Amino acid sequence: MERIKIGITHGYTNGVGYEVILKAFEEPTLLELCTPIVYGSPKVASYHRKALNLSTNFTTIQHAEEALENRLNIVECIQEEVKVDLGQKTEEADRATTISLDAAKRGLAAKHFDAQVMAPGDKMSTAEGTTILINERTRVALLTDNISFSDVSKHITSEEVSRKIADLDRCLKRDFALSGPRIAVLALNPEPGEEEENIIKPAIEQAGDNHIFAMGPFAADTFFGSQAYLHYDGILAMYHDQGYIPFQVLTNEYAIALHSAEDGETLTAAPLEDAQLAIAGKGEANITSFCNAIYTVTDVLRNRERYDEAHQNPLPKLFHDKREDNRRNPHAEAQNKTEKEK
């Protein structure tokens, strides 16, 4: 069976991106799980490898289709020389980051690989689809993101809350193989107000009508403070800080963001760390979140395959419904009625 192909952006060239990538694939464990395809610069990779005294081997390729299994592959999408100035923000590093992101984006759209993982420092686009913050304790989805707090209430409608609950439910079932997942929906206000009563509650009730187990709305402070989050498979927060801040407080080195596009297929994961310029070139970067992102996307892809296969040909109905006979034979219904009257 062909291994899953993972497209990887190289992060900020003056940060810890290449350190994390080279360390992660220094041992064969991840190479046995997937075929990594880094969009970047072999010369910059060699610079970091030498500076950090690492022994990771990689293969330089020009196109993702040339990627070899059991090897770290680097697509040479940056042809020009890139000066590495560890720990510094520079225009060259900014440009190299953009080139890598754009090349990986094109590769993902062209299906040259199965999923994308970003190195620390790269920002994923969350404009469309569902983004979930994941650690070993919980999963938090955001109703709104990248908008000012003053505009949040304008984006909270009953239709949007209903849609996000349904998206999260589908994601938990298909991506994480959870049967009947429990979803907690957070309130917008610390005390129940108009939004909770007229917008969020009706959306939760509609979810129940659609056989989705959603509860709430819960005030965020008491919900996280009482550790109620431990009893739910997923949480829907109304805005960025409401979900992100408690998640960061509760999380540790395993934290990642997972984004599933609206098409239900395009998948991107990223560790939550930034470029970590302060420790660039010192060999102190932690690879746990990056590795967790790799593990997560491979698990999700396999779960999706199993889920889609199971739901493609559902089991036939194992009982006989007399009502179906009545619909086909209207005289049968009259006969049943006569027998009951006797």
Tell what function each PLM region has.
Residues M1-K342:
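Anion-binding alpha/beta catalytic cores of soluble intermediary-metabolism enzymes, centered on
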